[in-house]
Structures are given as C-alpha cells and as structure tokens.
Amino acid sequence: MAINRGNIAKQLLPGLNAVFGLEYGSIEDEHVPLFEIENSDRAFEEEVLFTGFGEAPTKSEGAAVQYDSASESFTSRYSHETVALAFAVTEEAMEDNLYDTFAKIRARGLARAMATTRQVKAANVFNNGFNANFAGGDGVAFFSNSHPVVGGTQDNLLAASDLSETTLETALIAVQNTQDDRGILTGTRAESLHIPPNLQFTAEKILASTLSTTPVHFGFASNGTGPTNKDGVTNVNDVNAIRSMGMLPRGYFVNHRFTDTNAYFIKTDVPNGAKMFVRAPLATKMEPDFDTGNLRFKARERYSFGFSDWRSYYGASPA
C-alpha cells in the first residue's frame, strides 16, 4: 500500500518544528572484520577441502618407498539470497509534503533497513555456530568438538568458561595446536577476539592492561587460622602475557548482533574460513506508476554468508 496524505497529515501543514525518527545513527559494517569478502558471478559458490599428506615415514635401506594419497573431503556451498525492500508514495502526498520526508526515507530509511538485515545475517553465522541444525560442509556445527578428519575428529569448541585472562590464554594455546586433516600442525596463530557488547569492558581490561588481571587468593591457610582469607586482584609484578607477547595483534571487535551475551570467538589466520560473497551489490531504483502516479522506491542486493574451513575460528559459549 502506498503512503498517502492520510499517513502524513501533520506534514501537509506549515509550523512543525521537526519531523523526527529518521535521524538515528546506525551500526553498520560490523561484518567486515569477521568475514573474507569476495565477489561472485554465479548462482552459488562452492569450496572444497583437499586433504594433503601425513608425516613422511622412515625408509629402510633397500626398501620400497611408501606411497600416500590425498583426496577431496567436504564441500561448503554458499547459496546467494536476494534481499529487497520497497515503498510507494502517492503523487498527491509527494506534492503536498512540506518537509522533504520522502527524500530522507529513500536516502536513510532504505539504507538503514538493508544494512540491518545484512548485519543480522552475518552475525547469525556465529549465533547459530553452536547449533547442529546449522551444520557446515563437514556435517557438524561451526563450533564443534567432533569435526571429522582423516582417522578421527578435531575440535574448535573452547571450554564453556567465562571470558577471562586465564581462559583466553588456554584458548590461544588451543589455537596454536591446530592441525590439518592429516594431523600435521598448521602453524595457526590468533588474530583477533570478537565479542558481544556485554564483554567489551572485560576484553578491554584483559587486552589493554600492562599487568596481569588474574585474581589470586591471598591470606592464611583455609583451616581458619590467621586473618580471614580474601580474594583480590594480584599485586605481584606479573606481566599481561597476552599483551606483551602480541597474541591478539588486531585486538578485539564488538558485534552488537551477537545474541549470546557470554559467547566469544577467536579469529585465526587460517584462510578460506568465514566468508561473504557479494553477487549483486546494493542498488536503489525509483520509478513512477503511469496509472496511479505513485512513485515507487526499491533497494535490492544479493549475497551469502557462511564458512568453509572451521579452523578459521575458535568459539566458546559459556552457560
């Protein structure tokens, strides 16, 4: 239904000091640090994992060399979605509106709506990342302790412990122990931490503090002798190893569309991980309807979000 003069009755008369509701800011492009972004020229994109070789065995003198084999494993598919939104305005409403409302709706309202959908879809790759109903190409959730590999399973699911200096150190060790499908260490390093707004102050304290933020227990024995035991922040000269060693060189990023207020994710330097494919970039159109005189405005884009190599991220979802 087109927006008509009945929808904008106050804006047909002079004297309004302001028409508000269209001037709000927006939170956009939070998907950029999460995803590798590529263009696409087809209906869908596929990426296949190719397993390499295992460790080379020792060859005895005079013995035949041992052969190994490599093969394709699972395939990840990115099916592009079309996202579009439109509105129409009657010819009379356009003529009689005194406050240029429709220009603002076209410039800001459509862009805001399209950007919000894009950010929500991007964040949902992680919001659904612990749910087996949203499996990746290998048949399990993005963050799982049972990713199938040659000869067994591997995991990128961190312990369900709240974000702290200690749990982050443990997670960073797990990242460095990442192996390929044949069990060979990949030399993986962490790049950045990704969190909901609820954890931003915790992350800032952990990553920006020069000294350790790990709480310690000090006092006398727990049998009750001596002063009452107390918990406090360490007052010894322990460095913040995460910061001093540069373990997260890109720091942390807040994503306001993460729905789990306790979950956190570590991005690694493994390529071909979380990806966004852009099939058709955002475009807007305006055209009149000859019969009614209504003006119609439309915004449209096509893209897909997903992941290929699960080793690109480690995630935790504390209760």
Predicted regions and their residues:
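Sequence/fold signature of self-assembling virion shell proteins
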Residues: 2-10, 143-177, 187-192, 198-319
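Flexible, glycine/charged-enriched surface loops at secondary-structure junctions
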Residues: 183-185
